[in-house]
């Protein structure tokens, strides 16, 4: 009986790790780490969150990309022009020390200000 339990447990762990690993490495064509690699860097990742360090130079427009729901923490004052799929562009002032909740989104972002945009994105995986 113990041997059967050990084999079942091992099989469950292997299958679970395979599924989890596959879900984290399956390429999303709109993943910002892939399409905007010059501005989006993974700072931390586990099964629950992915934290991105984002630095958008003044005048830079990022390609269209996707984020799941999560929290943005702003580390600089800058002007962001965001265009969400199906909606008109909107310019927002981002202030250092503030934060904002975002639902899942597909968008482009342009830094229309004169300073670098610095953001920590906390993307939730559930």
Residue ranges: model-predicted function:
Residues 3-7:
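N-terminal export leaders
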Residues 9-17:
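Bacterial N-terminal signal peptides
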Residues 21-23:
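Boundary at the C-terminal end of the N-terminal hydrophobic targeting segment
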Residues 36-61, 68-72, 122:
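A short glycine-rich, His/Asp/Glu-containing loop-to-beta-strand
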Residues 61-62, 78-83, 99:
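Short beta-strand segments in beta-sandwich/barrel cores
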Residues 67-87:
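Glycine- and acidic-residue-biased ligand/ion/polar-headgroup-sensing regions
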Residues 77, 104-126:
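Ligand-binding loop in jelly-roll beta-barrel domains
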Residues 87-104:
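Short acidic-glycine-tyrosine-enriched beta hairpin
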